[in-house]
């Protein structure tokens, strides 16, 4: 079992219950899922780029990614409906907690010129989204075998009702917010 999951159950739940005066432990916000998305627009010309992106995302998440397809045709981007243009992974349960732990302790501190993550990236319902410019911050990616540096979007979906609750939840895990 992931250390952060134990830490959440043993300490974070009680802290947040006291802070927000919840009547039940079930009212305390929790992390529901973490979604990783990698858009590969260049996959239109070179199909191998998408395969490499899928391999990178599989290495980072430990789970096989789903290839996302274009929802509608956009002439300006030379995209037709149904073209494969990216990949995504939704992590829940044990894998989610393990990834969250790796993200906070290993990956985020390896970001170049890192000064903390913006606390303004909440969506109004307690979910946090962040972008990573380079996939090489994750230790699972071998720097020498990378064909191209790609970014990815990471969305942390919580059961929090407001941004304040969501931020308190992530801050309880020592999430590196900018001061």
Curated annotation (Swiss-Prot):
Xref: Pfam families: Ribosomal_L5, Ribosomal_L5_C
Keyword Cell inner membrane: no
A cellular component annotation (GO) from this entry: ribosome
Annotated keywords: Ribonucleoprotein, Ribosomal protein, RNA-binding, rRNA-binding, tRNA-binding
Function: This is one of the proteins that bind and probably mediate the attachment of the 5S RNA into the large ribosomal subunit, where it forms part of the central protuberance. In the 70S ribosome it contacts protein S13 of the 30S subunit (bridge B1b), connecting the 2 subunits; this bridge is implicated in subunit movement. Contacts the P site tRNA; the 5S rRNA and some of its associated proteins might help stabilize positioning of ribosome-bound tRNAs.
Stated family: Belongs to the universal ribosomal protein uL5 family.
Annotated SUPFAM superfamilies: RL5-like
Gene3D superfamilies: 3.30.1440.10
Matches recorded under PANTHER family: 60S RIBOSOMAL PROTEIN L11-RELATED
Top-level division of the source organism's lineage: Bacteria
Gene Ontology molecular-function annotations: rRNA binding; structural constituent of ribosome; tRNA binding
Subunit structure, as described in the record: Part of the 50S ribosomal subunit; part of the 5S rRNA/L5/L18/L25 subcomplex. Contacts the 5S rRNA and the P site tRNA. Forms a bridge to the 30S subunit in the 70S ribosome.
Gene name in the database record: rplE
UniProt-recorded name of the protein: Large ribosomal subunit protein uL5
Biological process per Gene Ontology, one example term: translation
HAMAP family the UniProt entry points to: Ribosomal_uL5_B
């Amino acid at each position: 079992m992931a250390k952060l999951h134990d830490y959440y159950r043993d300490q974070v739940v009680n802290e947040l219950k006291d802070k927000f005066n919840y009547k039940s432990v079930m009212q305390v916000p929790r992390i529901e899922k973490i979604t990783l998305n990698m858009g590969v627009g260049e996959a239109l010309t070179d199909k191998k780029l998408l395969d490499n992106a899928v391999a990178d995302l599989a290495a980072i998440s430990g789970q096989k990614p789903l290839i996302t397809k274009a929802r509608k045709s956009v002439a300006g981007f030379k995209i037709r409906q149904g073209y494969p243009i990216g990949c995504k992974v939704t992590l829940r349960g044990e894998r989610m907690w393990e990834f969250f732990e790796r993200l906070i302790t290993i990956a985020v501190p390896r970001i170049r010129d890192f000064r903390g993550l913006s606390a303004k990236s909440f969506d109004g319902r307690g979910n946090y989204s962040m972008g990573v410019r380079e996939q090489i911050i994750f230790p699972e990616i071998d720097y020498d075998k990378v064909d191209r540096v790609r970014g990815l979007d990471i969305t942390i979906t919580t059961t929090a009702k407001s941004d304040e609750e969501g931020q308190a939840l992530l801050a309880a895990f020592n999430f590196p917010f900018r001061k």
